[in-house]
């Protein structure tokens, strides 16, 4: 995949004295008082900003925050808390600029944060007039926001059409490289773990991966539907009986390629979904009518761990059990540890997956941790993301 990279432009001295517009993803969670509760995305944006400053550019950074109404600015929509955190991380003041579409004052060696881009009318619909105005603000447009790459908006797509130069920042470039390594040119065997509560939300991902992967591990409520498809009892567990035929089709598609969807041979059940519910390990064929399946059993976990350790590439999206409750966390912990110990290139994404990675402290053992939720899922579906597509078009001239 050919795209221009901001790091290359900087290395060649092409950013010196230039006005650089960086679209970052600074959409961080806040508490009721507006305080930032988790700043990973802000920290992840720093290398691109530092790169631009060190290259001698005049730097403008923007992002969306929350879901403001276009054309109506409210105090809770402000990037002010982000500007404060960014100032701390960069060790310099980062002024916040409102009403910036018609012009921004910034000198080489300076950085300013442009107020919440989703307040601008036409941002979400990718209005060409807005896009042209934003493109006129800069000499180089840099997209460093993988988390919004699946949306064709003014600051992710439109500006890239009209800017003199459009390129990928280091975070976006790293995401693209990791995805290429894992899905376009994987070292085999390629094993994907797709878990979550519903097949319906991840059916297109399962269908897309079933054409490419050597092993497709399902977990959570998704696994219950696959157990139904295999003729196993699931008691009163969460499942989607109306999607059993789709599950059977995924199993058949894998089998036709000599690959498999491993169905659990044992499970961990409880009579209630609760933090203090007693857990019981049962054979998959012996689940009672009043049982809730809340994790895979130790035998299944050991089989999957062996498969992951022998893999060449691993894609992980979703914990395989209710890992928030320790008695139903064994399966997810075993999978996390197997990924950590495997020599495979691994890529992981999705909020719950990141929480599991943090819980078991394996951040340094995962090849690449994706910052994008919805964008990561769309990549797994085999879709080309609009923000990446426009950078490819611009690179091709």
UniProtKB/Swiss-Prot annotation:
What would be one Pfam family of this protein? PGK
- Database matches in PROSITE patterns: PGLYCERATE_KINASE
Tell me where the signal peptide lies.
none
Report the InterPro entries cross-referenced here.
Answer: Phosphoglycerate_kinase, Phosphoglycerate_kinase_CS, Phosphoglycerate_kinase_N, Phosphoglycerate_kinase_sf
Q: Which UniProt keywords are listed?
A: ATP-binding, Cytoplasm, Glycolysis, Kinase, Nucleotide-binding, Transferase
Is Cytoplasm included in the keywords of this UniProt record? yes
| GO molecular function annotations of the record | ADP binding; ATP binding; phosphoglycerate kinase activity
Q: Which domain of life is it from?
A: Bacteria
Copy the pathway line from the protein's UniProt record: Carbohydrate degradation; glycolysis; pyruvate from D-glyceraldehyde 3-phosphate: step 2/5
Q: Which EC class does it fall in?
A: transferase
Q: Which residues bind substrate?
A: 25-27, 41, 64-67, 118, 151
Q: Can you name a GO cellular component term?
A: cytosol
Entry binding sites for ATP: 202, 324, 350-353
Q: What's an example Gene Ontology biological process for this entry?
A: gluconeogenesis
Where does it live in the cell? Cytoplasm
By sequence similarity, the record places it as follows: Belongs to the phosphoglycerate kinase family.
Describe the protein's quaternary organization and the partners it interacts with.
Monomer.
Q: Can you name this protein?
A: Phosphoglycerate kinase
Record the organism.
Acidovorax sp. (strain JS42)
């Amino acid at each position: 995949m050919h795209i221009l990279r901001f790091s290359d432009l900087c290395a060649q001295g092409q950013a010196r004295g230039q006005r650089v517009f960086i679209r970052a993803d600074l959409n961080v969670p806040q508490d009721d008082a507006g305080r930032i509760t988790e700043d990973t995305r802000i920290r992840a944006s720093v290398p691109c900003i530092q790169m631009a400053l060190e290259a001698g550019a005049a730097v403008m950074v923007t992002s969306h925050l929350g879901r403001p109404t276009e054309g109506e600015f409210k105090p809770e929509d402000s990037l002010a808390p982000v500007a404060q955190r960014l100032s701390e991380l960069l060790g310099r003041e980062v002024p916040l600029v409102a009403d910036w579409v018609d012009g921004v004052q910034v000198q080489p060696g300076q950085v300013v944060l442009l107020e919440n881009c989703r307040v601008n009318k036409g941002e979400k619909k990718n209005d060409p007039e807005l896009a042209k105005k934003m493109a006129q603000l800069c000499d180089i447009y840099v997209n460093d926001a993988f988390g919004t790459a699946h949306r064709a908006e003014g600051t992710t797509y439109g500006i890239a059409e009209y800017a003199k130069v459009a390129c990928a920042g280091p975070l976006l470039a790293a995401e693209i490289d990791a995805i290429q390594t894992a899905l376009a040119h994987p070292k085999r065997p390629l094993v994907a773990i797709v878990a979550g509560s519903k097949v319906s939300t991840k059916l297109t991902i399962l269908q897309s991966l079933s054409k490419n992967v050597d092993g497709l591990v399902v977990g959570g409520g998704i696994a219950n539907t696959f157990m139904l498809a295999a003729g196993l009892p699931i008691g009163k567990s969460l499942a989607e009986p109306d999607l059993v035929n789709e599950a059977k089709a995924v199993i058949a598609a894998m089998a036709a390629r000599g690959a498999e969807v491993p169905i659990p041979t044992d499970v961990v059940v409880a009579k209630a979904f609760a933090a203090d519910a007693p857990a019981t390990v049962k054979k998959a064929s012996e689940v009672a009518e009043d049982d809730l399946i809340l994790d895979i059993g130790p035998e299944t976990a050991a089989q999957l761990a062996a498969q992951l350790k022998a893999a060449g590439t691993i894609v992980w999206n979703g914990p395989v059990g209710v890992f928030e409750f320790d008695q139903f966390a064994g399966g997810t912990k075993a999978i996390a540890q197997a990924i950590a110990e495997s020599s495979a290139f691994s890529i992981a994404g999705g909020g719950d997956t990141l929480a599991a990675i943090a819980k078991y402290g394996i951040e340094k053992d995962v090849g690449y941790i994706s910052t994008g939720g919805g964008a990561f899922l769309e990549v797994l579906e085999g879709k080309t993301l609009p923000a990446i597509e426009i950078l490819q078009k611009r690179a091709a001239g």
